[in-house]
């Protein structure tokens, strides 16, 4: 069974991304197969791979983990366009442009959560440790109903809330 740990913070810019990057490198140095994971990221800074596009943050974390950069690590990328509209990328491919209301009401809890869980499951089958990164703050009450990146993902993946117990390496 994969071990997973989620890093959440009090706000955007709190240091979650750099902490996950560091943890990926530390545990990779210890000999574990490690992958980062962020269910949904909103950023115009992207990494363009061979036939896919994900958040640059998860690509850098994958480099830290010494693992292949893959759309599984960031199944949903939102690239803001302004006026509450974003280009939505799913599984590394452009899906469509959506207004926030359409995204929240018609996509995120239906298809978005399912896609994210499938990606996490695939990563967990090929890695010993998956570090999940939250987004912004899990305490933003105006977004909690639709927030798949923080507590919904923590509950669905049964991440460790207090500590990570690892098997010893021979």
Which ranges hold each PLM region?
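Flexible phosphate-sensing "switch/lid" loops adjacent to ATP/NTP-binding sites
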Residues: 2-14, 18-164
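A short, hydrophobic C-terminal helix/tail in secreted or cell-surface proteins
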Residues: 165-170
């Amino acid at each position: 069974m994969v071990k997973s740990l989620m890093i959440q913070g009090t706000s955007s810019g709190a240091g979650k991304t750099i902490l996950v990057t560091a943890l990926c490198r530390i545990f990779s140095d210890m000999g574990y197969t490690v992958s980062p994971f962020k269910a949904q990221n909103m950023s115009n800074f992207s990494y363009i791979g061979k036939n896919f596009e994900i958040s640059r943050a998860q690509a850098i974390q994958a480099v830290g983990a010494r693992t292949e950069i893959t759309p599984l690590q960031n199944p949903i990328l939102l690239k803001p366009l302004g006026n509450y509209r974003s280009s939505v990328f799913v599984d590394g491919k452009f899906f469509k442009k959506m207004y926030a209301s359409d995204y929240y009401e018609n996509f995120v809890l239906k298809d978005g959560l399912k896609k994210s869980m499938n990606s996490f499951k695939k990563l967990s089958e090929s890695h010993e440790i998956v570090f999940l990164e939250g987004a912004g703050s899990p305490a933003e009450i105006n977004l909690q109903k639709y927030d798949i990146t923080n507590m919904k993902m923590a509950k669905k993946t049964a991440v460790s809330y207090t500590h990570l117990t690892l098997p010893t390496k021979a």
